[in-house]
A protein has these predicted regions:
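N-terminal Rossmann-like or analogous alpha/beta NTP/dinucleotide-binding catalytic cores
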Residues: 1-71, 166-170
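Active-site cores that bind ATP or allylic diphosphates and position pyrophosphate for catalysis
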Residues: 61-170
């Protein structure tokens, strides 16, 4: 938290003072992801109940090999290797390796207007495929945490660099 407090002080100095959060407190806390696991679990379980989450047993080397030939941007498009495993296959694989958990993404184009970059359209299924929501060690992925946090904290405007613009439609 020491570094978070220093960052908050720097932002205050620049005139970018937050209304609430971190050391300031407020009604939408807790403000540190490490303290929000129960909140993420609640929303993760909603996706599980809807049948949108599945276990993935692929190692990084398997994912990298399955995506050959590799894209010039370095991104790996998940091929859906574990998406349709039978319950029996899941039990067998779980005995050998603890799974990470992915969310199923639809194969459709999503369009929005970015305040800086202008009109943007992307098909997440083709751009990255089903993505991780939870690592094998139980830690929730950024992609879940940021969506839940933005929604619950009333975030309406987000400034991002060009590299994560493809995550915008997740929020």
């Amino acid at each position: 938290r020491e570094f978070a407090d220093l960052l908050e002080a720097d932002l205050d100095w620049l005139g970018l003072a937050a209304d609430e959060g971190g050391s300031k407190g407020g009604p939408r806390g807790p403000y540190y992801q490490s303290e929000r696991s129960a909140i993420y679990e609640e929303y993760y379980q909603k996706l599980v109940r809807k049948g949108l989450v599945y276990p993935c047993f692929c190692s990084r080397s398997q994912l990298h090999a399955a995506d050959a030939p590799h894209r010039s941007d370095g991104n790996v498009v998940y091929a859906g290797t574990c998406r349709n495993l039978t319950p029996e296959e899941i039990v067998l694989r779980t005995a050998r390796r603890k799974p990470a958990w992915r969310v199923m993404v639809p194969d459709e184009t999503i369009s929005f207007v970015d305040g800086h970059m202008g009109p943007y359209a992307d098909n997440l299924a083709q751009d990255c495929g089903d993505f991780y929501l939870r690592r094998a060690d139980g830690v929730f992925a950024y992609q879940l945490a940021v969506v839940v946090d933005d929604a619950l904290m009333g975030i309406t405007q987000v400034v991002r660099g060009a590299d994560p613009v493809s995550y915008t439609h997740l929020t």
